[in-house]
């Protein structure tokens, strides 16, 4: 069956339908990872977006247990070629069946390099995936321009708290769309991790007397999370060590008077170099974000840049002055991607006093 990807600038790509045949409008973003497509599909940070995989052949090893949440989150999936015969001793099915099961539409057989070039040059834009051959551009384009993702954190956060038992330090993990490997990375280091819904009050979290607080990744515009920002102000005022990544990094900055802005096309992939400003050392990081903290709006008495992106000079991390708080824009837990920066979990544990 034919499928069509229609961009808000009027560009139309014609390909083959994969997964569900329902029609969707979403923000179109691209990911440059060569592997780890299942982790990408199950990353809650992609809620409200349709993902273009720039690597030309996707699905070679099928669906395996390597999932970062219980379900896939993108609105749509866009690939050059989808493997129809996955082969792996852990394979439990194909991407085609996985997308169909979860009612996610997609399109294959289009020039994803040309599509990515458009997004790089013109910036991230909205688009529609449809199987309707009688589509009307005059009707569709205004809808694409009007579409916004809104506050999607409420969609991806857990509904109730849950605990991963451990014998070491007690960590409160605020779930703004947390990938599984964040809690696993802490738990593997002995920590007992309590995962809290995004709108849990600071009073409830502090009342549990955690040794540290972790703020997770998540989707969307951080400025939409106004209620959460107010709670983070209270957590900042406490003496509890805090480690934040991705959306948590941005929300903590907003809670302390800094500003954020939307990037032209964001950072999404497993090969982004970041520089530690304290040592000069460069790490290859996994990233998935479309917003960034404006360092010019930082009060130097409150926070200072700790990491910077080598490619474009944007902020990749902050150290908070006089506080046991540090935040990063990238994913130290990887999945998918390199684990160069996984040592940051060890640093967080040392900040809490270390596991005995």
Where are the regions that the model predicts?
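Proline-centered loop/turn at the N-terminus of a beta-strand
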Residues: 105, 170, 241-243, 259, ...
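Active-site glycine-centered loops adjacent to acidic/histidine catalytic or metal-binding residues
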Residues: 111, 246, 289, 331
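Cysteine-nucleophile active-site neighborhood
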Residues: 217-284, 292, 337-352
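Catalytic beta-strand/loop cores that center a nucleophilic Ser/Cys/Thr
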Residues: 281-322, 356
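Beta-strand-turn-beta hairpins that frame and shape the catalytic cleft
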Residues: 166-171, 279-282, 320-325
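A glycine-centered loop/beta-turn motif at secondary-structure junctions
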Residues: 317-356
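Conserved hydrophobic/aromatic pocket- or pore-lining residues that grip, position, or stack substrates
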Residues: 175, 186, 213, 252, ...
